[in-house]
């Protein structure tokens, strides 16, 4: 029986069950089925009854049972599960008792029955014994008598165990429990294999785990060191076979599956040998699976002949094959593999990551010797790559795997590992000694370097592999390098071999983490220094590098030029080695370094080596920081970009110096290099030659070999591409450096750009390198032409500045070369350097410079990309990298984007200006910095965002000052600074004519797209946005899809996606007609070549911009969530140039001109409107007032058909959601060009003044007098047009920088909005400026933000497309004017809420007069901007309140709600008008209110269902109002806008009210009107209408603050709103407070007397608003809300209104 019990499953988990089952079968009563539990008390369910005579045994068993959690029963009852007895089982004794069979049934003797024991007594015992046994049974209660035994046995529910079996079972459970507790918890209280999920991974292992932890992690223990997976590039099996023990001869010969087969056998042996030590059955299963054909591991070790039997696709050739070996030997494959051009991408990747060459560069001295040897070896390997790599890799992998734990590494190749004693080692030894030493080298790169082996000519570190112990002792960085050392399996050694040396296979991960942190911290070479500090040779470099790091800008600059010599001295040996290695044929060295790289970069091998050395050198310099040269994902080596700057520096000093020891050195070099671009050019040429010999600088050495390799390879393969990219990258880096220096993070950027610069000179070492260096110097010269002066000047002021400027000068030079000097080699050179350096920089970040799309984006960022876009009806937009070859600078100028041309021109100008800027280098540098900052955003560096912004602002200030003297300089500064403050933006807009702005923008554009968008803000941004809208390029997805970029820009991308989705819906709608169509003389309508990448590109945020956006957006979002904005005031709206002066309008006025125009506008406004509230009259408001007049002027003129685009010639084509496609007619292009054309600021100012005097007054008068029909037409058209053109992207798109967002200038967004609103180019420009600011503020501040803080209003931009008419820039009602009269209405807080929502809902803005002033334009912007910017305006301004509403819908809702309540309560007399007017206005107001509410709700879009019904109902209503009052209102509103003060008169009030009402209703149609109406809404009118609605419908209770959407439904409320109109104006100023916060108190307090009550009511009703407004608006306000929604939605958002209304109130409530 015992044997049987033993036979039972090892885990007694089921033992009882089986026994009980057996018993059940034997016995009628089924024994209990109890299972062992996997826990510390496995027998917790067991209840034992012990019938044991032996006391000791009973005590022992009892203690064991208790220890295992079992229970002991002292009475034999049915509860017991097991009956343990020491009595012999009666097999036959139970004759006649059916229970006996149970014992046999359970062959286990434990089923001995009491009956059996009783029967025995019956048979042989005396009667006393029988009685005793019977008594025992009775005591147990199971057996009453021997005769009853059968029945008891039948009835018994327990299992009978013999004591011996019980002991065995207990012992088994104990052992299992011990294992379970020891970590074999998988085996949890039962079988060893019971819990394979908890395996203790020891030694080397690969673990694949899901981040979400939805799946059980997969792990693979690597018991044998050579089992460690290796990427054997030279194996026939493929690059990523799990190279196991049989990696030697078979692998050497074929590198196919035969070695795999042998590996399999070895692994089988291992499995057999390890079966005993196997920790878990799961491990055994894994081992077995490896032998199983279908198992994942079996794939790695396919049968030896599998390659012959199995067909497949060659991933290299992309060809299918039946037999792998035959295919590998085919000419096609060989030719393909030998063509290094086929592996450029891989080469780039490899070079950007840990690299053998880099490692060699890191250890130049050893590298020299080893490089020579390695080259011979590498040649041999090239001849027989499979043979050598396989043994080397196998041995290396073995040792690496063991290396961690065992001294096998130390012992040598022979000692594979305890587990694999010598199979791997013998194989390795069996292989060429080179392979063994190579493996050792790989394992211990440093040691290898120390002990050069003839076998390992490639890396000294590899050679040191001969003495594994030393290598093993080396720090992980060297190990990393060793892994990379692998020539043919550069990746496998990199990835696998080194980690074991580091003692951690996970060390790779750790390194990566370190790399990431460092890389993120220092995108430039510094990241490399930190990430890949070298301990051996690198120490010297690191020592030099450290000083460079410490003195980055000062010492670094000095070292960059001179101090690098210290680095050069350190590097001199390495450089000498590198040079010697370089001395070896670059191709040979390259081959030696990496077979894969060899293939790809045949001639570039030396360059790769040099690059690696450079990178390694940088790493070495960073030896204090861990470096992982062999890291598979090594950053391309910030040093590579650095080498270029270093070369420049060395140009000053020597290229040895120029070569950066480290990224820090590179930074210094960049500084130095920046100092003298021409010197750098010359030095590059000379230094490039010197570099070959004088890469003594650690960086220099590393950089130089890299440059050689890179340059050769890249020149040969990607010379054009890489150089082009390099130029762009250099440009970006330079810009980054400038901006970085400004920001305090310039060093990082500088480092990057310097690397590129340095790389170029070093490349010159080779003939190609020299050529590239010369070309680069040419580029540098070209760039320097404009930049050199700056660079030199800056250099003299400060080397750090020189750094910054030098990169910028290279940037400019490169840009110029891209444009003027298009030498392919130059481009290649730049690209190769910058590209790989950039790649290294971003390897762990976001910039995959090696990828085509990234190059395209870089080009785009630099404004050098030629967009071959098509404006067809197709919805598909090619990604930038899908658009074909990236045009070179040498491409026909026609193909060169305007930015490129402008950049070349601007560079020339800069050449001249640089001298000026030498005098005032800060502003110029600021401009460059801006450009660079934007470029560097891609670098994700804005470490010092605030510093950067400050600097930008300062730069802007300086440039603004310069702008008066030098419009171009100002423009550059403006572009770069991107109007840090609204005032700056206003200045920019007002200060420069459109032409000036355009030139500025063009210039900036050429410099950097983001910078361009900033400076363009007034002119070019408008055009770009228009063009972007016209031909909305899809956001560049590739870079954003890049993991690092995604991480950096994910928030931006999300926001842009939101805005785009909304924008797309709007995009589907025709772009809102700009004022230009209405203008008889469209100023901007001159055809602007949409080809200008800047124009097209402005929409997509550049990586730099995105980085900046990410930072600023996060800040802005936080602010928005708090209801704050960086600038908690409405963005100053630039004074719109009168529509009459079309050319002027399209240009920014000089500050003086703007001031004059503002004065004029102010006079006009005051003359026309007495209501103007000085409090509300901000500069922006005044500008807006001017704008309204301009808008008014243009509005009648600019009545685009509903379907017309932003410009007359621009038609939106049906497009897919997310894509805006426009057709541009010549007139539109002309208008755009005209807008961009430069105009003398003074002339523009004069024009503005004159226009304001003449046209403005006329319009002021006319607007008051203009028939409502005309205005309604303009409004309607605008309504139609505005919604059609959603802002191309989020308010955070590249169109406007976050700086602009922060500044509240709607930079590019505003321009786009201007265009979309269809303002005439001139007035559109002016108004666009205002709109841009307002919309920007809306976008930035007023954007209704979800709880998440992201603007929900973007939906409104989509849905607001219809409502966007309100945002029509043409009709920008100067809510200053309106707002002056109506800023007070606290009760219009609902309106204010609406204004914030009007940001969301343009009409809503009307609530706040102050905001309304801004919003009059902002609303236009919002609506005109397709409501995309609806939240753009800062919530602070009431003008911006609408705009603000978009960004912060909840706050806006609450604030607006509160405001309407306050306004209602206030019943400001200011806006009291005749009952007829009141009624009309109230209807309009109610419509507007509802529209606003709809806007708010639309933002929320919670009640989209109701929207359609309401919209339809309201649409009719609104249309009537719109057509009747809106014209009047519009006429008044424009006049109000232009001459808000005069219009503030009763007529103005009426107009305002009408505009308010009409705008509210027609806000969609006329943003200006909407704004005015909003102001009037703020006026008690709105409040009254709101209040009336609210009062009658107390369901809303305080929901009236929600501008009782029902107000529209309650037409009777008009009277109330009229009565309350005056107060709202009085309280408008308080409403200037950002609505975004939705702080009712925020708005209520300014509402003076009524502020408290309204605030209290609003606060009290805040919650009610959400509920009541949602419900009441839905119920009672269905009609009114629909009217409201229709009012602003009529065009754009009819579907959303109901939902938005419901949602908006709720949104308000939260705030």
UniProtKB/Swiss-Prot annotation:
The modification Phosphoserine is found at residues 306-307, 406-407, 417, 432, 435, 467, 542-544, 1091-1092. The keyword Glycoprotein does not apply. Residues 549-560, 908-932, 1435-1445 have a biased composition (Basic and acidic residues). It comes from the Eukaryota. InterPro entries: Replication_Regulatory_Kinase, Znf_DBF, Znf_DBF_sf. Residues 365-378, 1453-1475, 1483-1518 have a biased composition (Acidic residues). Keywords: Developmental protein, DNA replication, DNA-binding, Metal-binding, Nucleus, Phosphoprotein, Zinc, Zinc-finger. One of its GO terms (cellular component) is H3 histone acetyltransferase complex. This is Protein chiffon. The lineage of its organism: Eukaryota, Metazoa, Ecdysozoa, Arthropoda, Hexapoda. The gene is chif.
């Amino acid at each position: 029986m015992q044997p049987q019990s033993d036979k039972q499953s090892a885990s007694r988990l089921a033992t009882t069950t089986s026994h009980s089952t057996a018993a059940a079968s034997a016995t009628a009563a089924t024994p209990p089925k109890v299972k062992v539990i996997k826990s510390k008390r496995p027998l917790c369910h067991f209840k034992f009854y012990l019938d044991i005579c032996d006391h000791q045994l009973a005590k022992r068993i009892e203690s064991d049972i208790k220890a295992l959690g079992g229970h002991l029963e002292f009475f034999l009852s049915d509860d017991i599960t097991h009956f343990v007895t020491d009595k012999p089982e009666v097999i036959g004794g139970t004759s006649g008792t059916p229970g006996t069979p149970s014992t046999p049934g359970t062959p286990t003797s434990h089923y001995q029955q009491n009956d059996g024991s009783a029967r025995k007594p019956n048979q042989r015992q005396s009667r006393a014994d029988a009685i005793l046994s019977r008594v025992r049974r009775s005591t147990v209660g199971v057996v009453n008598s021997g005769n009853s035994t059968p029945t008891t046995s039948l009835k018994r529910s327990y299992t009978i165990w013999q004591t011996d079996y019980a002991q065995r079972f207990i012992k088994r459970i104990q052992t299992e429990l011990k294992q379970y507790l020891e970590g074999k918890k998988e085996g949890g209280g039962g079988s060893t294999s019971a819990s394979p999920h908890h395996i203790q991974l020891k030694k080397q292992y690969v673990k694949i785990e899901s981040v979400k932890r939805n799946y059980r992690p997969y792990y693979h223990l690597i018991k044998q060191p050579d089992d460690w997976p290796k990427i054997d590039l030279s194996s026939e099996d493929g690059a990523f076979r799990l190279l196991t023990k049989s990696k030697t001869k078979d692998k050497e010969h074929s590198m196919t599956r035969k070695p795999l087969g042998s590996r399999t056998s070895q692994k089988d042996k291992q499995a057999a040998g390890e079966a005993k030590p196997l920790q878990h059955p799961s491990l055994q299963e894994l081992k077995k699976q490896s032998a199983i054909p279908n198992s994942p591991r079996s794939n790695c070790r396919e049968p030896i002949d599998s390659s012959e039997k199995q067909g497949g696709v060659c991933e290299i050739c992309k060809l299918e094959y039946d037999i792998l070996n035959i295919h590998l030997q085919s000419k096609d494959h060989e030719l393909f593999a030998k063509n290094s051009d086929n592996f450029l991408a891989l080469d780039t990747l490899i070079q950007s990551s840990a690299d053998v060459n880099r490692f060699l560069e890191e250890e130049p001295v050893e590298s020299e010797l080893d490089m020579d040897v390695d080259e011979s070896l590498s040649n041999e390997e090239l001849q027989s790559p499979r043979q050598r790599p396989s043994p080397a890799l196998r041995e290396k992998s073995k040792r690496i795997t063991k290396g961690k734990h065992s001294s096998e590494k130390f012992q040598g190749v022979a000692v594979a590992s305890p587990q694999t004693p010598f199979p791997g080692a013998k194989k390795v030894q069996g292989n060429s000694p080179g392979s063994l030493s190579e493996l050792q080298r790989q394992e211990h790169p440093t040691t290898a370097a120390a002990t050069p082996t003839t076998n390992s000519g490639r890396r000294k570190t590899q050679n040191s592999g001969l003495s594994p112990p030393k290598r093993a002792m080396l720090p992980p960085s060297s190990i990393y390098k060793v892994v990379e050392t692998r020539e043919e399996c550069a990746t496998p050694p990199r990835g696998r071999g080194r980690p074991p040396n580091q003692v951690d296979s996970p060390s790779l991960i750790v390194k990566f983490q370190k790399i990431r942190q460092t890389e993120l911290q220092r995108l430039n070479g510094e990241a490399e220094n930190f990430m890949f500090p070298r301990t051996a040779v690198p120490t010297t470099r690191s020592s030099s590098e450290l000083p460079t790091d410490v003195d980055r800008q000062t010492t670094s600059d000095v070292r960059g030029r001179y101090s690098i010599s210290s680095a050069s001295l350190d590097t001199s040996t390495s450089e000498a080695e590198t040079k010697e290695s370089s001395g070896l044929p670059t191709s040979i060295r390259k081959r030696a370094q990496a077979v894969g790289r060899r293939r790809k970069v045949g001639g570039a091998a030396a360059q790769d080596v040099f690059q690696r050395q450079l990178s390694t050198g940088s790493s070495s310099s960073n030896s204090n920081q861990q470096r992982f040269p062999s890291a598979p994902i090594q950053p391309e080596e910030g040093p590579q970009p650095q080498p270029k700057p270093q070369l420049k520096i060395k140009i000053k000093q020597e290229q040895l110096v120029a070569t950066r020891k480290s990224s820090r050195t590179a930074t210094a070099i960049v500084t130095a290099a920046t100092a003298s671009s021409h010197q750098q050019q010359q030095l590059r040429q000379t230094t490039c030659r010197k570099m070959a010999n004088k890469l003594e600088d650690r960086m220099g050495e590393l950089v130089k070999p890299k440059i050689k390799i890179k340059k050769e390879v890249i020149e040969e393969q990607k010379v054009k591409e890489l150089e082009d990219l390099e130029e762009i990258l250099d440009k970006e880096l330079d810009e980054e450096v400038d901006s970085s220096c400004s920001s305090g993070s310039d060093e990082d950027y500088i480092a990057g750009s310097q690397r590129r610069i340095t790389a170029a000179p070093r490349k010159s070492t080779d003939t190609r390198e020299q050529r590239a260096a010369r070309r680069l110097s040419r580029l540098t010269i070209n760039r320097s032409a404009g930049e050199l002066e700056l660079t030199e000047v800056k250099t003299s002021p400060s080397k750090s500045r020189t750094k910054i400027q030098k990169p910028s000068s290279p940037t400019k030079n490169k840009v110029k070369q891209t444009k003027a000097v298009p030498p392919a080699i130059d481009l290649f050179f730049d690209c190769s350097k910058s590209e790989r350096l950039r790649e290294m920089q971003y390897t762990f970040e976001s910039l995959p410079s090696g990828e085509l799309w990234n190059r395209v984006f870089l080009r785009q960022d630099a404004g050098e990309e030629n967009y071959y876009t098509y404006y067809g009806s197709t919805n598909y937009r090619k990604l930038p990298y899908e658009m074909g070859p990236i045009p070179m600078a040498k491409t026909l100028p026609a193909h060169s984007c305007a930015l490129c041309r402008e950049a070349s021109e601007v560079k020339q100008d800069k050449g001249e200006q640089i001298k000026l800027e030498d005098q005032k280098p800060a502003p110029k540098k600021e401009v460059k910095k801006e450009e660079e900052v934007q470029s560097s955003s891609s670098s994700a560096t804005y470490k010092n965002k605030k510093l950067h912004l400050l600097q930008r602002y300062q730069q802007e200030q300086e440039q603004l000052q310069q702008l008066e003297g030098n419009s171009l300089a100002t423009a550059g500064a403006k572009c770069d600074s991107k109007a840090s403050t609204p005032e700056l933006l206003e200045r920019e807009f007002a200060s420069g004519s459109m032409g000036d702005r355009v030139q500025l923008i063009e210039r900036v554009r050429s410099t950097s797209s983001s910078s361009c968008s900033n400076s363009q803000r007034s002119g070019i941004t408008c055009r770009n946005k228009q063009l972007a809208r016209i031909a909305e390029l899809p956001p560049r997805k590739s870079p954003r899809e890049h993991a690092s970029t995604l991480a950096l820009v994910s928030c931006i991308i999300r926001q842009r996606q939101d805005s785009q989705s909304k924008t797309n819906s709007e995009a589907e709608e025709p772009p809102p007609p700009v004022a230009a169509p209405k203008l008889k003389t469209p100023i901007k309508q001159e055809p602007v070549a949409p080809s200008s990448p800047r124009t097209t590109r402005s929409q997509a945020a550049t990586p730099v911009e995105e980085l900046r956006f990410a930072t600023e957006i996060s800040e802005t979002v936080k602010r928005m969530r708090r209801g704050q904005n960086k600038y908690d005031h409405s963005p100053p709206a630039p004074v719109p140039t009168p529509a009459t002066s079309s050319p002027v309008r399209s240009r920014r006025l000089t500050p003086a001109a703007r001031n004059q125009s503002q004065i004029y506008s102010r006079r006009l406004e005051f003359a026309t409107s007495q209501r103007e509230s000085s409090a509300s009259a901000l500069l922006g408001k005044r500008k807006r007032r001017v704008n309204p007049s301009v808008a008014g002027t243009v509005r009648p003129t600019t009545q685009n058909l509903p379907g017309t685009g932003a410009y007359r010639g621009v038609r939106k084509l049906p497009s897919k959601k997310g894509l805006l496609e426009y057709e541009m007619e010549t007139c539109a292009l002309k208008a755009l060009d005209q807008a961009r054309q430069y105009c003398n600021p003074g002339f523009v100012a004069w024009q503005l003044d004159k226009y304001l005097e003449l046209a403005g007054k006329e319009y002021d008068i006319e607007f008051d007098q203009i028939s409502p029909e005309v205005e309604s037409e303009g409004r309607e058209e605008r309504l139609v047009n505005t919604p059609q053109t959603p802002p191309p992207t989020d308010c955070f798109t590249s169109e406007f920088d976050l700086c602009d967002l922060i500044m509240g200038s709607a930079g590019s967004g505003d321009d786009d909005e201007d265009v979309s609103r269809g303002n005439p180019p001139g007035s559109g420009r002016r108004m666009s400026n205002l709109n841009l600011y307002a919309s920007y503020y809306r976008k930035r501040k007023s954007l209704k933000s979800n709880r998440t803080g992201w603007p929900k209003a973007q939906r409104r931009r989509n849905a607001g497309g219809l409502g966007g008419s309100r945002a029509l820039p043409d009709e920008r009602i100067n809510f200053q004017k309106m707002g002056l009269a109506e800023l007070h209405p606290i009760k219009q807080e609902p309106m204010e809420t609406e204004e914030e929502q009007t940001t969301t809902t343009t009409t809503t803005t009307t609530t706040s007069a102050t905001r309304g002033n801004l919003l009059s334009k902002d609303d236009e912007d919002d609506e005109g901007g397709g409501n995309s910017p609806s939240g753009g305006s800062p919530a602070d301004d009431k003008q911006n309140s609408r705009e603000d509403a978009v960004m912060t819908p909840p706050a806006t809702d609450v604030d607006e709600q509160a405001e309407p309540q306050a306004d209602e309560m206030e019943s400001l007399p200011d806006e009291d008008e005749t009952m007829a007017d009141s009624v009309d206005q109230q209807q309009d107001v109610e419509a507007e209110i509802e529209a606003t509410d709809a806007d708010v709700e639309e933002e929320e879009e919670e009640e989209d269902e109701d929207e359609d019904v309401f919209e339809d109902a309201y649409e009719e209503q609104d249309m009537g109002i719109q057509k009747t009052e809106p014209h009047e209102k519009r006429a008044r509103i424009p006049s109000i806008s232009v001459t808000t003060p005069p219009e503030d008169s009763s007529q103005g009030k009426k107009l305002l009210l009408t505009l308010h009402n009409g705008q509210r209703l027609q806000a969609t149609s006329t943003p200006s009107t909407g704004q005015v109406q909003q102001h009037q809404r703020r006026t008690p009118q709105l409040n009254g209408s709101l209040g009336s609605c609210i009062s009658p419908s107390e369901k809303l209770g305080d929901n009236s603050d929600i501008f009782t959407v029902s107000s529209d439904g309650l037409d009777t409320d008009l009277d109330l709103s009229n009565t309350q109109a005056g107060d709202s104006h009085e309280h408008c100023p308080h409403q200037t407070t950002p609505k975004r916060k939705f702080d009712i108190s925020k708005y209520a307090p300014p509402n003076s007397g009524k502020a408290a009550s309204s605030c209290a009511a609003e606060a009290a009703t805040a919650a009610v608003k959400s509920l009541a407004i949602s419900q009441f608006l839905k119920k009672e306000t269905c009609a009114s809300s629909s009217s409201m929604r229709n009012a602003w939605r009529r065009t754009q958002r009819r579907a959303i209104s109901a939902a938005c209304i419901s949602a908006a109130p709720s949104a308000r409530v939260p705030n």
